[in-house]
Each structure stands twice: as structure tokens, then as C-alpha cells.
Amino acid sequence: MSQSEKENQGSGEGKTQDMAIFSPPVVRSGAGALNRALFTKTVNLAAAAVNDNRLISKYRKELEHSKELLRQDRLSPIVNHPDKALADQGKKCLLLSPNVKAPEPETWGAALKEGVQKKELSVIPYELQLNYDYWTYHDIITSILPEELHDDIPSGFNTAGHVAHMNLRERYIPYKKVIAEVILDKTTNIRTVINKVDNVGAESEFRTFQYEVLAGPDDMQVQVTENACSFEFDYSKVYWNSKLEAEHRRLINMFEPGEVVCDVMAGIGPFAVPAGKKGVFVWANDMNPESNKYMQVAINRNKVSQYVRPICEDGRTFIHHAADSVLEAHKNGEHVLIAPKPPSRAKKAPKPEPKRVDIPPTISHFVMNLPATAIEFLGCYRGVYAGHEDLFSAESGRKLPLVHVHCFSFKADDETPLNDICERITKYLGFPVKPGNPDVEGEVAVHDVRDVAPAKRMFCASFRIPREVAFAERV
């Protein structure tokens, strides 16, 4: 070994070169069919052939400590002996780091040398065979795509059950089939890969989209579990975004058992159903009949029919009469009975009576998860409690509802998005607001939800309906 090679072994450059031997072969197959057979490679390594399997653990620890043991993702350092006869006898080897060379004892550490001297092991050449199954999605795609496309390799996608939903940029479209096949191979539980061919909502008021199947069957009937609830739906007919699970959970955590929540654009119930499971009364509306159908499926599946009421109408109409509907339910004495926990067998106390929980007279929260246009619905809150000022008297202790409205705005590090959102709320609500504490009239808390595009983010603005708005004369 030359002096420069020895120096490189101890340098970062040498380590990088060593690890490069595990990279897949470059297969610039372009937009053609994926040929998995081309992804094979022989990596020449050294191995410590341990004569007595009882010593494997000892030498593994020693070689790990000396950093001579192979440490490579998805590869076990313990392998069968390359000699089939010895392998049939159960003999094992420990794979060694690429900088250890079998015919060069000067590259061996003290543990290896001692093991050889004691005749407890021998250092032998080992041909490690790698194939398509070993490499990751990123490894395979990097070897297929031309270098000029390596800066932004498609990796993120939404999932809905067994469906991976991609939104490929134009320059990757020629490779869409290959990309989809590799995703299918490398992603657990994915059976179908689709690509969106238009913007969500571009052709549908229900936020559904046109798609093409890139790999797998055209099967869009999916099952999803989110926030401890099970959903089943046709992904091509309703809106679902797995990236919103944390936002769903954030708002659900704000709801208290026994409160009333009105979900204006409820979809199939990602807010409503888990909230119902928590003991929250939910009026859940969506104007898409398919969403309403699958919400009812989720309500029954998750056993929350006592708490969640599916409604199918325009969101503006829903807001106009939501308060009256809740108040009427309260006046009619609508309630749920919560069965008590059964007493332990050791106790002979009489069985306790079920707990009655009445629907309260007022709404605690409105949720408006339609970020493209929800702010434009805010004018509908004018007069929502007209004539019912007494419900919010000082003696009652009740507060006007909190509104949680999702929206899009600019991506910026300064106050620009907050000011933009407050200006739009002011315009449609007809009442001036500014960033601040949502419990203070005229102030709005803005939560940053997620990135949706390079210069666009999704936010959730929360505020209490001002008294001037809630008690205004109804139009």
C-alpha cells in the first residue's frame, strides 16, 4: 500500500471513498422500463473467519471497538462462510471494514493479529453480493436519473392507505413510471402510485383531483387510521391529506368533552370523529355527498353516533343556522348517557347510574378547514347569535365561539403573513382584527401549519367572534 493510500485511510476522504463501494451501479436507463437485474454488484471485502462460533460474540465486540468491523446500513456483519462446505457446517464470518485487506497484514489491527496468532480466526477475502433489494429508493433513483436532476429528487408524497399520491414536477414526468415502480418496491404497504394531473380544486369544488395511475392497480378504496380512529373512503371522490394529522390533533386537543364544535368543512371527519370519541358534540358538515357518505361510515365504525351529526349542505347555510340548531337541541333536552365503569368483582356496591351529559346551549368552536376560500365565509357569522345576547351574559360565564379558520399566505420570516391574514379576516368579518391573543376581542392567534409550495404556507387563524358581529342584525 502506498503512503498516500495509508494517509487516505485515516482521512474523511478515504472513508468516503471506502463507503462509495456500496453505492449502486450507475444505470442510466432513462424513461424506459425499470430493469432490476442491472442492479447487481460484487463488493470485495475481507472477513474474519472464526473457527469456533462461540467466539463470534467476543471478536465482534473487539472488532467493533477497534472500528475494524463493517458498519453499513442494512448489512449484518455476521455472514455464512464463503466456502459452502464450511457454511454447511454452520461456520460464520465477520465482515470487516473496507480498509482492512486480507492479503495485507499491515492493515490488520491488534485483535485480528492476535486471533490469527491464536489460530482462532483467519482473515480471508470475501465477495459480498448486493442486488436491487439492498439499495434504498434514493440510491436507485440517483443511479437512474441524469445528474442534472439530482438536486431535487422526488421523495415526498401523500399517502392514503395503500395509495401513494405524487405531485411530480414537469422535468421528472419522463421518468414517472420508473419513479413510481421504485416507490412501489421500496415503500411498505404501498400498492398503488398515482400522480396528480391538476391542482386540487381546479376542476372540482370538492377538492378532488384528476390523477393517473403510474404503478399498481387503479384501486382508490382505502383504509386509514388517524388519531386512533379508522376511516374508509374512495380517495378519488373525497379530500384527504395525511400531512394534516398533527393539525387535526392540535385542534382536537383544544376541545373539551361536553362542548359543541361545528365543523363547517368537515370532509370525511378527521376533526369530527376523533373529537366525538373524546366526548365532544360535533355538528359536522360537508357539501360533498361522497364525503358525507364516508363520514357516516366513519361515525358508525368508530361508534360515535351519539356525538357526531353528519350534515350535507353549503357551508354558508350551515353557519347561518348552526347556533339555532344547537340551541334547539339543548331546549329539547337532547343528551347522551355515559355508562359507568363496572365495579370490580371484589366490591358488592350497587351498580352506579349512567352519567347524563346534556348538549349545551352554545357552540364553543367553529372549524373551517378549507384554506383556499374559508376566510371568504366569515361574513356569515354576522348575526349568528342575534337576539340571544342573554346566552352570553356575565352571569352565564359563557364565551362566544372560537373560530379556527385555515388559510394560505406568503412564506416569510417577518410579520407579512400575519398582517396579510388579519387584513383578509378584517375584510370578510367586517370587524378590525390584529395579531394577538384569541381570547381578546379583535385579536387573532395565527398558527403556522405547514409548507404547501416554495413561497406558500398554510396557517390557522383563531379568534373569538366579536360581540358586534355575533349580535348584529341578521341579513
Swiss-Prot record:
Its EC number is 2.1.1.228. InterPro entries: MeTrfase_TRM5/TYW2, SAM-dependent_MTases_sf, TRM5-TYW2-like_MTfase, TRM5/TYW2-like_N, tRNA_Gua_MeTrfase_euk. GO terms for molecular function: tRNA (guanine(37)-N1)-methyltransferase activity; tRNA methyltransferase activity. It holds the Pfam family TRM5-TYW2_MTfase. It is found in: Mitochondrion matrix; Nucleus; Cytoplasm. It comes from the Eukaryota. S-adenosyl-L-methionine binds at H248, D286, M287, D314, G315, N369. One of its GO terms (cellular component) is nucleus. Monomer. Specifically methylates the N1 position of guanosine-37 in various cytoplasmic and mitochondrial tRNAs. Methylation is not dependent on the nature of the nucleoside 5' of the target nucleoside. This is the first step in the biosynthesis of wybutosine (yW), a modified base adjacent to the anticodon of tRNAs and required for accurate decoding. This is tRNA (guanine(37)-N(1))-methyltransferase.
